[in-house]
């Protein structure tokens, strides 16, 4: 017999015969939710319900509605789609089919050029396969059998994947009817758990993301635990399409990106205003919270990157140039540079903590296929800071940072923030004592503030644990922006130290921290969160004054000067155009406040006020209108 324990919903234990299946354990220990369980965590490892459990351990259920459960049924859907495509187009060769956020895709090599016109037939075939409710069966195969099987099918992409599996590592396949795919799993017990699905788009994708390889056909889809959840997702995607920051910014003339500078932003005047407002806002917050702003070089010698470890682990993502037979790398991050400032003189423990911030321009050689507007770029500015401190100071610094972070998110209109703690990975540097203390120094501030957080087991970096802060936008999408990362390794590698109270050298802890992540991406998030109607304090034009006729142009100019003297960003449209046309143009440009000025308004030194999103016009004295305007543009 073996003993199985669980902490869900309360700590309980049960005895089972050796080699009991996950399905039997689920039925016995979680009878009320057994029908919705698609897999189990066994001692922290995810496995399907058919796999036997042969020793004492702990289990936790994975239900179909959970994030992990949804990931599993999307993996199921990817296999079902691959099977359907092959049944419709027998010459199809299969590449890879992973899950992605809210969906899945599969890469195909076939003679037929797939288009969205094929989706109906593929979806119909998928529905037929699901209706059969065949089981997903996991099998472990000897390497030779797997190679022969895929050779006989001519599946050269699978053979290439097999060739990269280390000798001695278990090779698993999943069978579904007569369909067999190379796969680690896990999968749900059978196809019926894929309750609702839809194919969404098709694109080209190079095999393994390498432009030297063949271009494959990638079909995307989404799958959900219910038709209602699918309908809600489709509605949100349609709403997201309307909010696409690339389209909105193009309409408003805020920025553009072109092929001659892939992944780098051409900021237009109004977009650059938004950028600078955000930068200056963060700068003021940093000063208030005790940070010192620095500026470091963009290119540094290869030797520094070798010392920091980035050359070994990050070189393929770095832009490298040669100068006088030296290799220089354009920096992909700021941290090694900040260490250089720290170690530029002897530091005392009395100086710590040192909070060093930079709006650092960084570059990363991201694959061209992954670039996406402002959300994924090659050239970007991090609102980056590094705190050099002692182990004893970490807790208070994390507490201070969280308070700053929440101030910022609230001002930008984000009230829903989730927190995740990524703790020690299996491969790590440092003693268990250091990791215990470090994890506690991240958890204690959250506990003290009553902040709920989830734990990403084993997902910390090898050099320290981290907290991640994720925003939820107005249509429910999540964006990971803020980070607190402890680092025991970099200061040691780069020779940073301070003189302690004992007169000896000590290595500081570095806290890597960011609030926005990158300014570019955060602006993209803001545009989509507000559908382009960003708050007045951020708007590049806060007030537009429209003249009804040329007779009031001088009065309108006086109004513009009055507003400008109060640091309002104002534009005057005194063109000889129809006033209705001017109003429509101001609405299209999403100007928060519009003052309309005609003979009547000029006669009594007033204005007619229109707010964006409201069709109503309010007549008031110019002085009162300005006071109301100043209140509006100062609100955060």
UniProtKB/Swiss-Prot annotation:
Homodimer. NCBIfam families: thrS. It comes from Anaplasma marginale (strain St. Maries). Catalyzes the attachment of threonine to tRNA(Thr) in a two-step reaction: L-threonine is first activated by ATP to form Thr-AMP and then transferred to the acceptor end of tRNA(Thr). Also edits incorrectly charged L-seryl-tRNA(Thr). One of its GO terms (molecular function) is ATP binding. PROSITE patterns: AA_TRNA_LIGASE_II (PS50862), TGS (PS51880). Its EC number is 6.1.1.3. GO terms for cellular component: cytoplasm. Belongs to the class-II aminoacyl-tRNA synthetase family. Its cofactor is Zn(2+). It catalyses: tRNA(Thr) + L-threonine + ATP = L-threonyl-tRNA(Thr) + AMP + diphosphate + H(+). Pfam families: HGTP_anticodon, tRNA-synt_2b, tRNA_SAD. One of its GO terms (biological process) is threonyl-tRNA aminoacylation. This is Threonine--tRNA ligase. Residues 244-535 are annotated as: Catalytic. Zn(2+) binds at residues 335, 386, 512. Binds 1 zinc ion per subunit. The keyword ATP-binding applies. Keywords: Aminoacyl-tRNA synthetase, ATP-binding, Cytoplasm, Ligase, Metal-binding, Nucleotide-binding, Protein biosynthesis, RNA-binding, tRNA-binding, Zinc. It is found in: Cytoplasm. HAMAP family: Thr_tRNA_synth (MF_00184). Residues 1-63 form the TGS domain.
């Amino acid at each position: 017999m073996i003993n199985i324990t669980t902490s869900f919903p309360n700590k309980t234990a049960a005895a089972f015969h050796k080699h009991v299946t996950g399905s039997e354990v689920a039925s016995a220990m979680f009878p009320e939710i057994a029908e919705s369980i698609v897999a189990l965590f066994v001692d922290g490892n995810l496995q399907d319900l058919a796999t036997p459990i042969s020793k004492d351990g702990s289990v936790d259920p994975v239900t179909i509605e959970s994030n992990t459960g949804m990931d599993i049924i999307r993996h199921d859907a990817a296999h079902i789609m691959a099977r359907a495509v092959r049944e419709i187009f027998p010459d199809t060769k299969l590449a890879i089919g992973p899950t992605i956020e809210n969906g899945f895709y599969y890469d195909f090599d076939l003679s037929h050029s797939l288009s969205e016109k094929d989706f109906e037939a593929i979806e119909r075939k998928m529905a037929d396969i699901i209706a059969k409710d065949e089981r997903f069966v996991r099998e472990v195969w000897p390497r030779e059998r797997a190679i022969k099987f895929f050779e006989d099918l001519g599946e050269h992409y699978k053979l290439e994947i097999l060739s990269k599996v280390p000798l001695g590592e278990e090779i698993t396949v999943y069978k579904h009817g007569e369909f067999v795919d190379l796969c680690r799993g896990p999968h749900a017990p059978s196809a019926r758990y894929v309750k609702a699905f839809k194919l969404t788009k098709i694109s080209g994708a190079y095999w393994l993301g390498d432009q030297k390889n063949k271009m494959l056909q990638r079909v995307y889809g989404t799958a959900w635990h219910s038709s209602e959840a699918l309908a809600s997702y489709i509605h949100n995607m349609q709403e997201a399409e309307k909010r696409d920051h690339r389209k909105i910014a193009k309409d408003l003339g805020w920025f553009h990106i072109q092929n001659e500078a892939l992944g780098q932003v051409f900021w237009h005047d109004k977009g650059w205003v938004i950028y600078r407002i955000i930068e200056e806002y963060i700068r003021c917050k940093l000063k208030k919270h005790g940070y010192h702003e620095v500026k470091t070089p963009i290119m540094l010698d290869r030797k520094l990157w070798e010392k920091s470890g980035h050359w070994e682990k990050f070189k393929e993502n770095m832009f490298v140039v040669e100068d006088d037979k030296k290799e220089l790398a354009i920096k992909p991050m700021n941290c090694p540079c900040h260490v250089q400032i720290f170690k530029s003189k002897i530091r005392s423990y009395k100086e710590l903590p040192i909070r060093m911030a930079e709006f650092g321009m960084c570059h990363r050689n991201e694959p061209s296929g992954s670039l996406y507007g402002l959300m994924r770029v090659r050239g970007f500015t991090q609102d980056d800071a590094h705190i050099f401190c002692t182990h004893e100071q970490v807790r208070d610094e994390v507490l201070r940072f969280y308070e700053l972070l929440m101030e910022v998110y609230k001002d930008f209109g984000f009230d829903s923030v989730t927190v995740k703690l990524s703790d020690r990975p299996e491969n790590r540097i440092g003693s268990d004592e250091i990791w215990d203390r470090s994890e506690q120094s991240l958890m204690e501030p959250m506990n003290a503030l009553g902040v709920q957080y989830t734990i990403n087991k084993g997902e910390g970096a090898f050099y320290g644990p981290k907290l991640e802060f994720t925003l939820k936008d107005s249509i429910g999408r999540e964006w990971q922006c803020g980070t607190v990362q402890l680092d025991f390794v970099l200061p040691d590698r780069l020779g940073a130290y301070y003189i302690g109270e004992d007169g000896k050298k000590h290595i500081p802890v570095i806290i890597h921290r960011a609030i926005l992540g990158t300014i570019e991406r955060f602006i993209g998030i803001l545009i989509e969160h507000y559908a382009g109607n960003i708050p007045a304090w951020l708007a590049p034009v806060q007030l537009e004054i429209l003249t009804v006729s040329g007779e009031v142009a001088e009065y309108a100019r006086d109004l513009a000067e009055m507003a400008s003297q109060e640091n309002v960003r104002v534009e005057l449209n005194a063109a000889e155009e129809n006033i209705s046309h001017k109003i429509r143009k101001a609405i299209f440009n999403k100007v928060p406040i519009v003052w309309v000025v005609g003979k009547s308004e000029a006669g009594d030194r007033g204005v007619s006020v229109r707010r964006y999103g409201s069709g109503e016009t309010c007549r008031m004295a110019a002085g009162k209108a300005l006071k109301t305007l100043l209140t509006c543009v100062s609100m955060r």
